[in-house]
Amino acid sequence: VRGCICPHPPLLIPEIGGASLARVEATVRGMQALAADLGEPETIVVLSPHTPSYADAHVVKVAARLTGDFGSFGCPQAAFTFDNDPALVDLLLALAGGDREVMLVPGEDDLLDHGVLVPLSFLRPQKLVSISIVNAYGEHRALGKLVRRCAEELGRDVVFVASGDLSHRLTPDAPAGYDPRGRSFDELVVRAAEAGDFASLSNLERGLVGGAGECGLRSFIALGGFLGDDATADPHVYSYEGPFGVGYLVARFGRPEGPAVA
């Protein structure tokens, strides 16, 4: 079983980042190393906090082909197209229908947001499944477990990508302003990633999470559900940095290469 944590700042796209790429060199190298370690998995499932959703229902895109570009960031020429995995999507929807812990509905649009596109500008899946988050943090672990169950039933080589940035309040000039809880939050998440300790992420104090101004914790909790007891098997943190007041973490869990499902 394999999964990873990926940041999603659009400035990682060279045409957008320009000279600023030099300030996120550790993140770029981390993503490149992650991509090399993962190889070309059969399917990548991405959970993005920026995918349009409902407050209480995850949305999984059902279009045969999924597309997106960075036009909203002034770079429409950076465009991507991926094949969906209809068998996995169909099974997710079918099993969610009988699972009271997961509310999952089909999404008809084929557009991918930057929370999906930035990680996928480095990674090389044969197929892509895109799922959104919901409001309640605690419900995401069950979603991850559902994805794991479906991958096992299909015998799929699935990599779960938890897309998300850490605190947006690390410095006085950060996008969301400064809050000292931001640094504390990031330190806790990085330590948890180093140990594969996803259980601790589900029990973080609510005030700390709110003060941090994060956008990745829900995705990380879902990844923990997907990995289960395998989370501690081979955790590896490639990089962490926050040069613009936002924390960027790149980490992998599970074997570097090989099928996610035996």
Where are these regions (language model features)?
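Flexible, D/E/H-enriched segments
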Residues: 1-41, 53-145, 174-262
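Beta-strand elements within well-structured catalytic alpha/beta cores of enzymes
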Residues: 43-48, 156-164
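Catalytic metal-binding/acid-base residues of hydrolase active sites
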Residues: 50-52, 166-167
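Short, catalytically relevant binding-site loops at active-site mouths
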Residues: 136-137, 166-169
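Non-transmembrane, aqueous-exposed alpha-helical and coiled segments at domain scale
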Residues: 145-153, 158
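Short conserved catalytic/interaction loops centered on acidic-Pro-aromatic/His motifs
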Residues: 158, 169-173
